[in-house]
């Protein structure tokens, strides 16, 4: 409802009805919801009112059934009725209900309710016209030739029939004449039968023999809408000649590109980091992130992995260890993508505990990680118990949390509430917890941002960056809908289908105190504009993001993969070529280890970020 009230126009209209796309995304779902609620209330009122009138004898079904020549059933109901009194054995008089004619007020009430019900059916039938643009009945998604030339006229006739039936229901309530109403209802049933038979016959006899010619305009609608909805209309196609030999001048002109050629892939590097840099069994490198940093005045591509705490790997799983002592991960391992030691190991710019950095751009002064990718449990900080920071040889270094993250347990009621919420009696009874203690929960960064903005869709791969000596998580967020007319729906990450997407938001989470900030990255997206109207203090302009973080923004892999999948088909803009799938592309497959060629078991190539200078450009890009 809030989206309906704050709706932002798309500035684009559908090709069939000429309505702005915002009508389908924001308005139509609300109309359908409201109509469904109203219809449910009317049906409930009909059932309750009809039951009461029957029990009171104000509604005579026998008369109604007699109009349909159902005399035997009418006789069983007792025919006409009246109310009489009779005394039994000299006792008080007892009222006896005997069938009589329907009460005029009851009939009027039922007639009005029937009229309202049939009116909602008429409105719902009219709204179903617009659903034709977000369903598939022809060769492509959206209304096809049969829909435009057969279904739309049938639906309009149905709307007229239900509207007429609503008026005649009101007429029945006022006059008691039921036959005209039954005639109108019979007309709606007939139209329903026609709508179930005629379109299929029309499709087989008229459309199928010459489908390409008939469907060409609608294929064009689908191509144009899909390219707009997925942002493919912004793609600039260039032809790059690849038949010229590489010269020394080419190498010199692309020196930075060559310096940043990746020698390390994520999977083997993650395994290597785990072997040489986890240091303790309760630490875990969950992922390796690819980013770029300016080091000594030169852009370098860096592989970076945060060292998170894996509480399930603690040798002693006592409550005090899991909740009060071992509370956070510590530091990162990071190195260039293009260097290897003589032993075949990665060169590390940041390593060990406490983290030692060989370059000032990657120096971390606040290495504690209280919020991460695998931190799923609550912890309590600033307690009487020592809080483990990091191991130092045979000894441990301890710390006290100095951040503002979490909630202060400064009252018995608040402590009782969280003890009940997390099902922990020990939290309530522990003598280590003080009024200054803070409980930190929702520490998984993906779950954390989703709780703040559940209406956004988030990228699967949060990545950590070093900025001004601190660690931050950046999570790309998308605005999506499955209501964009004529746009082909596809699943994102194998989950729910959508047919419109924009990378409209960049979410930033402080790894130390959990502060979440959302920055509006696409000022032209109508959906994020609508959310910004609803939650004006939630989304900040991208210009407010610190420059130290802006330099680490990137094009997300999830949306790039989705756009690639769409573009394999929708690079074809000629309807005939598209219809025949004459130029369908395939995403390359990667051969498995030990195999010379990709086979059926090979996985599709995934996107990779790299630093390179494209032909015709003056400088390298990421």
Give, region by region, the residue ranges found by the protein language model.
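Soluble extracytoplasmic regions of secretory-pathway and membrane proteins
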Residues: 1-622
């Amino acid at each position: 409802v809030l989206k309906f009230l704050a709706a932002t126009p798309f500035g684009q209209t559908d090709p069939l009805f000429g309505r702005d796309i915002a009508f389908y995304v924001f308005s139509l779902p609300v109309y359908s919801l409201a109509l469904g609620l109203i219809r449910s209330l009317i049906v409930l009122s009909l059932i309750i009112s009809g039951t009461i009138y029957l029990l009171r004898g104000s509604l005579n079904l026998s008369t109604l059934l007699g109009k349909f020549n159902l005399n035997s059933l009418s006789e069983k109901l007792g025919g006409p009725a009246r109310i009489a009194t009779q005394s039994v054995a000299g006792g008080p008089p007892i009222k006896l209900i005997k069938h009589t004619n329907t009460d005029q007020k009851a009939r009027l009430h039922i007639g009005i309710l029937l009229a309202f019900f049939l009116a909602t059916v008429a409105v719902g039938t009219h709204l179903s016209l617009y659903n034709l643009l977000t369903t598939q009945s022809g060769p492509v998604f959206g209304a096809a030739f049969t829909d435009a030339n057969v279904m739309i006229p049938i639906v309009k006739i149905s709307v007229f029939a239900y509207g007429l039936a609503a008026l005649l229901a009101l007429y029945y309530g006022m006059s008691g004449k039921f036959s005209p109403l039954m005639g109108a209802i019979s007309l709606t049933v007939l139209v329903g039968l026609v709508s179930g038979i005629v379109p299929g016959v029309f499709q087989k006899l008229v459309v199928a023999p010459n489908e390409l010619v008939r469907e060409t305009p609608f294929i064009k609608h689908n191509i144009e809408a899909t390219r707009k909805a997925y942002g493919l209309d912004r793609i600039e196609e260039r032809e790059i000649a690849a038949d010229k030999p590489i010269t020394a001048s080419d190498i010199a002109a692309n020196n930075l590109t060559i310096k940043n050629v990746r020698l390390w892939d994520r999977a083997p590097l993650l395994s290597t980091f785990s072997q040489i840099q986890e240091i303790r069994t309760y630490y875990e490198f969950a992922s390796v992130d690819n980013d770029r940093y300016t080091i000594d005045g030169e852009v370098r591509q860096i592989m970076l992995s945060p060292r998170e705490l894996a509480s399930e790997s603690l040798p002693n799983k006592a409550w005090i260890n899991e909740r009060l002592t071992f509370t956070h991960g510590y530091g990162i391992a990071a190195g260039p993508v293009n260097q290897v030691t003589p032993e075949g190991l990665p060169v590390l710019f940041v390593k060990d505990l406490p983290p030692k950095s060989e370059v000032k751009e990657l120096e971390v002064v606040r290495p504690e990680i209280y919020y991460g990718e695998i931190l799923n449990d609550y912890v309590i900080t600033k307690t009487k118990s020592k809080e483990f920071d990091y191991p130092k040889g045979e000894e441990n270094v301890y710390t006290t949390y100095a951040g503002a993250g979490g909630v202060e347990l400064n009252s018995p009621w608040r402590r009782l509430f969280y003890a009940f919420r997390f099902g922990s009696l020990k939290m309530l009874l522990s003598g280590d917890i003080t009024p200054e203690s803070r409980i930190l929960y929702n520490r998984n960064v993906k779950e954390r941002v989703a709780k703040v903005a559940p209406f956004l869709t988030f990228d699967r791969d949060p990545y950590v960056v070093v900025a001004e000596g601190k660690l931050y998580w950046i999570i790309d967020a998308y605005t999506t809908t499955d209501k964009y007319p004529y746009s082909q729906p596809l699943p994102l990450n194998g989950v729910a289908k959508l047919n419109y997407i924009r990378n409209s938001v960049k979410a930033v989470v402080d790894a130390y105190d959990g502060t979440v900030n959302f920055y509006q990255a696409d000022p032209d997206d109508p959906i994020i504009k609508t959310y910004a109207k609803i939650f004006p203090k939630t989304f900040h302009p991208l210009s407010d993001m610190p420059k130290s973080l802006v330099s680490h923004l990137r094009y997300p892999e999830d949306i790039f993969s989705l756009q690639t999948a769409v573009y394999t088909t929708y690079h074809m803009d000629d309807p005939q070529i598209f219809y025949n799938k004459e130029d369908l592309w395939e995403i390359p497959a990667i051969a498995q280890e030990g195999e010379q060629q990709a086979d059926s078991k090979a996985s599709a190539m995934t996107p990779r970020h790299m630093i390179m200078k494209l032909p015709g450009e003056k400088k390298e890009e990421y």
